[in-house]
Amino acid sequence: MTGIHVKEGNLFVENILGAELAKKYGTPAFIYSSEVIRNNYALYSNQKREDDLICYAVKANSNLNILKMLVDIGSGFDVVSGNELKKCLLAGADKNKIVFSGVAKSEEEITHAIENEILSCLLYTSPSPRDRTRSRMPSSA
């Protein structure tokens, strides 16, 4: 058996006893199974159309090793901040597989995306609270 499982009352992650991982890394600890991640990605990938792009939401977990693994298996990335964008680029992500989206982007974040030729930028803007209420303020304000 592989991935993450319990056998005879003991937790195993990719056939490594959980107690041994706890001894080596201490607790609490985050332990991930690359096999589970790869298998789950394959389940999605096998169902998509050829032109579809699966984009991992980096805000869910920006661990560099996980991002590198996802790069290796062909994943795209959904990023919402400049730091998430930097991590994906550091992991070796294909700039054509990065979607930079969301609200409240700084000029620095947008410039960084442009300088790195991130072509898929979905930027949503809305007036600031001050601008939205300005029309309701007395003219002397």
Question: Regions from the language model: what does each represent?
Answer:
Residues L43, L119, D131-R132:
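A very general structural signal that marks isolated residues within well-ordered alpha-helical segments
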Residues R136-A141:
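Hydrophobic alpha-helical segments, chiefly the membrane-spanning helices
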